[in-house]
Amino acid sequence: MKTLNTRTGLAAMSVALMLALSACGGGAQAAGESSETTSSAPVATASASASAASTPTATKASASASVVAEPKGSEVVEVRAADDTNADATIAKQAAIKAAKRVVAQDNRLLNAWLHGDFEHTSDEELLKFVAPEKLKQVTDPIQSARNDIKNNGGVFTGNVTIRDVAVTDIFTYDYPDGTSYPYSVLRVKFCEDWTQLRTPDGERAVTGPDSTATVEVSVLRLQDGRYVYNGSRELGTGCASS
């Protein structure tokens, strides 16, 4: 029985997963951050095509309408803040933080769905609810890798990749190509990613050794239409402080 490509391929899928949208340098300016510290390395950036859209205010009402209750498996939902995040206010900051954590939670749910063989909601149209348009290929490639791993291993994986200790470590204001900007529009989210419960079809651990846990940082971007999308990730190191 072949094991999946260990963390180099599988976890790369999570840390690459829908992933991967290279690091954000560009128009991000520090606006505020949580009590946790983080590396000074850049996070992912969104180009003009990612943010070129209508710019409705992300109000509480519109946010509530856009959130699907308890999405399952590979279902992709738009993530919007539960309060208006256009203003530079504490309530807006907290709403943005919660939205960023929901993006990370959806990323994890989709990863597990694909590893379990659920590819129902992987059309370009559906994936674009969650990923910037110019990053689509960096999402579809890992999905194909999951399909290949399942085929090569003779079946789907069981168990789940889990995450814990999720915390927003940095928040920035993003300057969009048209000259507009919104506070709390780029957020870095750090967490522990744990692969110890994932099993191959024959019941063996899919990932073993020190690579079975990792500290990961995800960048989340607020698009001009109010959506918060997965905007890249990187592995900060193997193992987790809490492990």
Question: What does each model-found stretch correspond to?
Answer:
Residues 25-28:
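Bacterial signal peptide processing site
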Residues 19-23:
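C-terminal motif of bacterial Sec signal peptides marking the signal peptidase cleavage site
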Residues 2-13:
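Bacterial N-terminal signal peptides that target proteins for export
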Residues 35-67:
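Extracellular mucin-like PTS domains
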Residues 62, 71-74:
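Compositionally biased, low-complexity intrinsically disordered regions
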Residues 74-158:
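Core segments of small alpha/beta cavity-forming domains
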Residues 121-243:
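Structured, amphipathic secondary-structure segments that form assembly/contact surfaces
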